[in-house]
């Protein structure tokens, strides 16, 4: 089955690193995470869940672990269709991407508050 996209949606860059990018789509009210070879669509709630699950991974403990366990983590988020199987380096890169994204969102919120406060 071939589907044709009839409407064009514009994605706004929120934050980019060499490992990936996060975009915001106002028309669809969602976020696109371009990371680890795939582009995944998240609503804001699921993006927060992704951030929480990545932040809870103890990278230092995993690096200091001397057992023969594989150095990968499976990140699965309830109520989302996406799953990531990532190495420790990829987890660090995803954490950096998510941290930068939420810093940019907070900065945008602060600027919006200040500019709207000046205008009124």
Model-derived features: positions:
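Positively charged, low-complexity terminal tracts
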Residues: 1-120
């Amino acid at each position: 089955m071939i589907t044709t996209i009839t409407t064009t949606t514009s994605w706004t860059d929120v934050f980019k690193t060499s490992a990936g990018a996060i975009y915001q789509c106002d028309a669809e009210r969602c976020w696109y995470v371009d990371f680890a070879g795939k582009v995944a669509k998240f609503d804001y709630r699921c993006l927060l869940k992704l951030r929480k699950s990545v932040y809870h991974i103890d990278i230092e403990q995993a690096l200091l672990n001397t057992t023969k366990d594989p150095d990968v983590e499976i990140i699965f988020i309830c109520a989302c269709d996406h799953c990531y199987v990532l190495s420790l380096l990829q987890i660090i890169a995803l954490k950096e991407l998510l941290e930068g994204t939420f810093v940019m969102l907070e900065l945008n919120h602060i600027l919006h508050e200040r500019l709207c406060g000046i205008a009124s």
